[in-house]
Amino acid sequence: MSFDTAKYPTLALVETPDELRLLPKESLPKLCDELRQYLLDSVSRSSGHFASGLGTVELTVALHYVYNTPFDHLVWDVGHQAYPHKILTGRRDRISTIRQKGGLHPFPWRDESEYDVLSVGHSSTSISAGLGMAVAAEREGKGRRTVCVIGDGAITAGMAFEAMNHAGDIKSDLLVVLNDNEMSISENVGALNNHLAQLLSGKLYASLREGGKKVLSGLPPIKELVKRTEEHLKGMVVPGTLFEELGFNYIGPVDGHDVQALSHTLKNMRSLKGPQLLHIMTKKGKGYAPAEQDPISWHAVPKFDPASGTLPKSKEGAQPTYSKIFGQWLQETAAKDSKLMAITPAMREGSGMLQFSRDYPQQYFDVAIAEQHAVTFAAGLAVGGYHPIVAIYSTFLQRAYDQVIHDVAIQSLPVLFAIDRGGIVGADGQTHQGAFDLSFLRCIPNMIIMTPSDENECRQMLHTGYHYQKGPTAVRYPRGNGTGTELTPLSELPIGKGVVRRQGKTVAILNFGTLLPEAQAVAEKLNATLVDMRFVKPLDEALLEELAQSHSTFVTLEENAVMGGAGSGVNEFLMAKRLAVSVLNIGLPDVFIPQGSQEEIRVDLGLDAAGIERRITQWME
């Protein structure tokens, strides 16, 4: 998309923050209007995260206007809201390539720009990293400042509070901006708090406060009275007691869409010592009415027509997604079992649980961004005689690994893990690919791991795992649509048993998961035996021994890291049994996989049918 200087005359003057800081303060509102419109025009043409960025336009402009970035460090939590930041930091003309193969990274990324001081993608990491940067800056002694921007959702995670507790203890110079888009501010409250924020962040108030502390330090009763009086006065208009208790100087809440007032407050706060928290109120989707009214649907969007105010509907005849299949199975099972308890760490819509949460509110728990708690909470439910299901993305299960081992597996508790987004996820890049779950789960004792090849198998495996009471189970399924296979009545599968789909000669393709259609095409061409292994753990050892008697070559196929994955399990078994079979392991390579469409990535990695066939024939030459 070419940049229209006539449509964006103020934004045209700003390629980098250095140029932004040359603008008069009076022109900042106009810049924000143009930046918001440019974001709308760009994302509607290219797809991407949308509503969050619309809500942080004024904050982004104010931060780069006041702080000397990139010398000063600006850390974005998660990064969904950082599109305006990318536009203002030398990437304006490439923003339409975001999330595409070879394009801009979907999140702040260190390799992409000196303004991206921390690569992000998962939530609640900013304050911990920012505190480390602040300590390093103090040791450096050059006056570098550190700012962390975190949302009201991300700040609920335990890691964020751990970091704030540490910051309050060591008292490093750090600003945390809490971007709160869950509330709306009336005009009067907003004006009052904006004025209060400017007073409380000013040098006069800060010096009086610190000076008063020193004078009164020897008079405990008076000091305590003054402290309580200050807290009562501030408590009348600000909800900052929790942050003050953690050792932060709290300012706010203020209107996050008044760029001039925000700049003034930030300028005051830049010189304050110790940990500071600025609480701003914003509107997710600000400036585009459909996104304001439904920010969840407009959080991440495909290409759309801004004039229509609607998102494109799914293609007619498209098969249901695996997430939807899971949600339907939940509904079906809960209707028969009041002890079913479904848990999600803030991924209700993504995991296909929206309708379930409405129909069965007493059996549904959204624990917020708290993956560790989600798993141990499930363990407690299992101890109490209930049947917990943890619905979680593969990439986020990584955050609760110790809980899976310590709180569930060691105790052989019957918790079902419904692992969504297993394998290649696509446009969100390195931080979101589900590349490692089979590897890190396979080594855990007492764990049953299933990999469905289609949506019907997915249902049967969920049913099997749900009724397995000897320990934890995991069903791992991908992002995307099913194959259209017929859904059959639910029944329990025999644990650890695969199915031979095609009988061939010499080569046996052992498929784990939804690459089965590609494997089928290759097996037909090579006259190979094709096995739907179904279980990563336990493996169908009897079937493997039988196949080893009649085949000289095994090819394992999975959308997981080759290192430690399902294929590694096959290798270990063959070596333990001293079976003379050569093995080719096909899966994800030992790299972090960048963004692109799922189809593009599979072709690049040789995981499409042509690539699989090519790798097998070349290996056998």
From Swiss-Prot:
Give the GO molecular function terms: 1-deoxy-D-xylulose-5-phosphate synthase activity; magnesium ion binding; thiamine pyrophosphate binding
| Enzyme class, first EC level, given as a word | transferase
- Cofactor comment in the record? Binds 1 Mg(2+) ion per subunit. Binds 1 thiamine pyrophosphate per subunit.
Q: What does this protein do?
A: Catalyzes the acyloin condensation reaction between C atoms 2 and 3 of pyruvate and glyceraldehyde 3-phosphate to yield 1-deoxy-D-xylulose-5-phosphate (DXP).
Could you give the subunit structure recorded for this chain?
Answer: Homodimer.
| Residues annotated as binding Mg(2+) | D152, N181
Kindly list the positions annotated as binding thiamine diphosphate: H80, G121, H122, S123, G153, A154, N181, Y288, E371
**Cofactor entry:** Mg(2+); thiamine diphosphate
Which organism encodes this protein? Pectobacterium atrosepticum (strain SCRI 1043 / ATCC BAA-672)
What is this enzyme's catalytic activity, as reactions?
D-glyceraldehyde 3-phosphate + pyruvate + H(+) = 1-deoxy-D-xylulose 5-phosphate + CO2
Q: Which Pfam families does the entry link to?
A: DXP_synthase_N, Transket_pyr, Transketolase_C
State the name under which the record lists this protein.
1-deoxy-D-xylulose-5-phosphate synthase
Superkingdom of the source species: Bacteria
InterPro entries xrefs:
Dxylulose-5-P_synthase, THDP-binding, Transketo_C/PFOR_II, Transketolase-like_Pyr-bd, Transketolase_BS, Transketolase_C, Transketolase_CS
The protein's UniProt keywords, in alphabetical order, are: Isoprene biosynthesis, Magnesium, Metal-binding, Thiamine biosynthesis, Thiamine pyrophosphate, Transferase
Q: Does the keyword Metal-binding apply?
A: yes
According to the UniProt entry, what is the EC number of this protein? 2.2.1.7
UniProt record, GO biological process = 1-deoxy-D-xylulose 5-phosphate biosynthetic process; isopentenyl diphosphate biosynthetic process, methylerythritol 4-phosphate pathway; terpenoid biosynthetic process; thiamine biosynthetic process
Family (UniProt): Belongs to the transketolase family. DXPS subfamily.
